Amino acid sequence: MRIWIDADACPKAAKELVCKFALKRKLEVWMVAGQPQVKPPFACVRLVVVESGMDAADDYLVEQAEPGDLAICSDVPLADRLIKKQVAALDPRGREFDARNMGDKLAMRNLMADLRDQGQMGGGQAPYGERDRQAFANALDRLLTRLQREADLRASQPHR
C-alpha cells in the first residue's frame, strides 16, 4: 500500500502528519504536484512534479495509484476518479470519500461552484487549524489501520 498526496492543495501540517504515520507504519508516500514543492527529508517520501497542464497532477495520481492505496486530496472530482478505481480517499480535514457519499459530495461541490460563479458566494474554506489537524490525524489512523487489515487479509488468502 502507498499513500498518495495531491501536494499542491494539501496543507503543510497534513503532509507532515502523513509522513509521520508513514514512517511509523513503514509505508511509501508519493507527493504529486504541478508546482515545485519542498520534499520532506525522509527516504519513504517521493516527490513527483508533473508537467504543467490542466489536471496533469490529478491524471498522474489516478494512473499510478492502485486499488488498496490511499490518496489525500480535497479535490472532489479527483476523489471520485480514485474511488472508482478502489483507491481510498481522505481529505486533509479528516473527511473520507467513499462510493456511498460521492454523489452528495459532487452535487454539493457543483452547487457551490455555481453559486460562486454567480457571485452569490465568495471565498473558500476556513484556514486549516488545530481542530482540522486533529480530525485528520484520527481519520488517517483509522483508515490506515483498516486498509492494512484488508491488505493483510488479501495477502493471506490463496490466489485463485
UniProtKB/Swiss-Prot annotation:
Pfam families for the chain: DUF188
Lineage top rank: taxon: Bacteria
InterPro entries (UniProt xref): UPF0178
Membership in a protein family: Belongs to the UPF0178 family.
Protein name per UniProt: UPF0178 protein PA5247
Biological source species: Pseudomonas aeruginosa (strain ATCC 15692 / DSM 22644 / CIP 104116 / JCM 14847 / LMG 12228 / 1C / PRS 101 / PAO1)
